[in-house]
Amino acid sequence: MIHEDDRQPLLTRAFLLAQRLREENKLTKRMRMKQILESWKPKLPPKCELSVEDVEKVGQELSQFTAWFHDAFGRVEPTQLFELHLQGLLSEAERKNMEAIALRLDGPNRVRNLQRLMSEYQWDESSMRKRHWQVAAQSLEDEQGVWSIDASEFPKKGRASVGVAPQYCGALGQTANCQSGVFICYSSPKGHALLDSRLYLPKCWFEPEFQERRKQCRIPEKTTFKTKQELALELLKPLLESNQFGGKWITGDCSFGNTESFLEEWPQDSYYLAEIACTRKVWVKATGISAKWKTEGCTVEQLLKVKHLLNWQTHKISEGEKGPIVAAFARVRVYWSAERTPETERWLLLRNDATHKIKYALSNAPDDTPMKELVRVSGARWPIERCFQEDKSELGLDHYEHRSWTAWHRHMRLVFLAQLFLLCLQIKFKKNACVNPASSTPANGVQFPATQAPTCLSCDPGRLSYTAQRSGLSLPP
């Protein structure tokens, strides 16, 4: 005897036709997405000197590039939305938020889908991060590579976004309502790129009255307060342990260099050149110095009064768009603590550039480190600043309207990938590119990791933003 289940629909002709229509709707949506992805056409100026064949290859490069990240999704819809969002970041749209991208590339019905991509769909974050670093290392790795750490702020008007609070905002130069994140950049003679980030949560976000806001912003329950310096060390550790990137140097500004605990926990087998404030106290090792300064210490700014102590020399830092960039440098061995032990001995590097504002930096590099090496590393601070400037102005780094913890980090990752694609594109064609001819990059450009790539979705050329048109986002001038 067959028992009917009232919860199951009867297999009537009307029901079967409805199911068929539903399947046809799914197929229609997939075909429409395929057409949208295929309609993306590049618009490159003559400055890039790309032939018609090269222009067609741009689409192939994007299709191949995005294919390496398909494994992070597991479903067709989020994979296609990932490609759509990446195209939007690379488009000519003035705003790069989800609504603007959807309206430009597909229409208002796609806005909700992109929102789900950033906040609801499952991503294998670890897999995407691993592949991101793998492709970046293939493009940038060099023994002269330098890591840079820095914070960047994003002004906000409301109070609902994750991590927003009154705090110092570098973008405005004052305390303001904003979010702040810690970022890691890797630079080499081949170019530079942002590789990871972490949103900073001010202490107030861990107070009881913020419990509901933490829940609404989907902050992981086990998240605890950490300083920006602690976040930077957490971000650096897996990158260094991956052994994919050459170079032992790490640079940071005063917000990191002035924190002794941060420098004391520095990763082994690496050197830092960290900027410090002019009021930072040191103990001089050299002779001919006031006995009081040797015992009680002095500020680094006070050392300027001892003329025989500093041997100023002019050095070329890099080649700029308007000619060589030069500055005067001096250095002296100091102790960074009153203990004055060999373990606390450091290089103090002084730099006087065109602004005539002297900058100071400490380094744990060995005593026999050449001056030209310190000069080279001191010039490696600008790549991360340029990344911020160009990613915000061209790739929508600060155009997001997400409020959750997950969406903030996903947005940053997608912007990093868009930036990396532009770098790969420029190295690939080597037209109007500033690539070190002595590098190990093959003559035919970037070679993706030697693993089997997943089958690409239909994703052909499209309109690039002004930065993409220049095809020079990630390379020095």
Where are these regions (language model features)?
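A short, flexible helix-boundary coil/loop motif
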Residues: 11, 15-77, 201, 208, ...
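Conserved, well-structured functional cores that handle cations and Mg-NTP chemistry
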Residues: 34-251, 255-299, 329-334, 345, ...
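Extended, non-catalytic structural segments that build the interaction scaffolds
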Residues: 85, 356-381
